[in-house]
Regions:
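His/Asp/Glu-enriched, well-ordered alpha-helical/loop segment
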Residues: 1-74, 90-91
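Generic structural signal for well-ordered, non-membrane alpha-helical segments
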Residues: 10, 35, 39, 113, ...
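Generic recognition of well-ordered alpha-helical segments
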Residues: 16-19, 45, 95, 101-102, ...
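Short, solvent-exposed cationic patches
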Residues: 121-136
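C-terminal cap of metal-dependent C-N hydrolases
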Residues: 64-121
Length: 136
C-alpha cells in the first residue's frame, strides 16, 4: 500500500519509509533505523496493521502479487554500490520504473499504463472538492 493524502500529502510510501529511518537515527543514533528496518515497516508492518499478513507486504505464494521496481542508475546513485536498499532510501527515486498491482502492470518504464488517468484525476478533483466543501 501507499500512504494517502489524509496522512501525507505526497502519497509516497518511499518518503514515509525514509522519514521513519531518519527519525530512528535521530532519536537512537546513526546505527539505529536501518534501511531494512524501514522497508520491513513499510511492507510487512503495513500489512500487519491492516490485518493482511501473508496477503500483502511480501512476495510469497498466495500473496496478491504487488511489486514496485525502481532504477538505481543515474547521477543520484553514482556512489551507492554496497547496499541497494540503503541507496534506494537515501538517494530517493522520484517514481517507480515498473509497478505491478494484483498481478497487473500499472506502471511501465515510469509511465502509467492506463489511458484513463486524465478521467480518473478529473473525477478525483470533483470528489475531493465535494468532500472538502463539507468540512468548511
Amino acid at each position: 500500500g501507499v500512504d494517502g493524502s489524509s496522512s501525507a500529502d505526497s502519497a509516497s510510501l518511499w518518503l514515509e519509509a525514509r522519514q521513519a529511518m531518519l527519525l530512528a537515527k535521530l532519536q537512537n543514533g546513526a546505527a539505529a533505523g536501518t534501511a531494512r528496518m524501514a522497508l520491513e515497516i513499510a511492507t510487512r508492518g503495513g500489512a500487519g496493521c491492516l490485518g493482511r499478513i501473508g496477503e500483502i507486504g511480501e512476495i510469497s505464494v498466495g500473496a496478491v502479487g504487488d511489486i514496485a521496481v525502481w532504477s538505481l542508475t543515474g547521477p543520484a546513485f553514482a556512489g551507492a554500490i554496497a547496499d541497494p536498499i540503503e541507496a534506494w532510501l537515501r538517494c530517493g527515486p522520484v517514481s517507480a520504473k515498473h509497478t505491478i498491482v494484483n498481478g497487473k502492470s500499472v506502471v511501465e518504464n515510469g509511465q502509467l499504463v492506463s489511458n484513463k488517468v486524465d478521467d480518473m484525476l478529473r473525477q478525483h478533483r470533483v470528489l475531493a472538492q465535494q468532500m472538502q466543501s463539507h468540512l468548511g
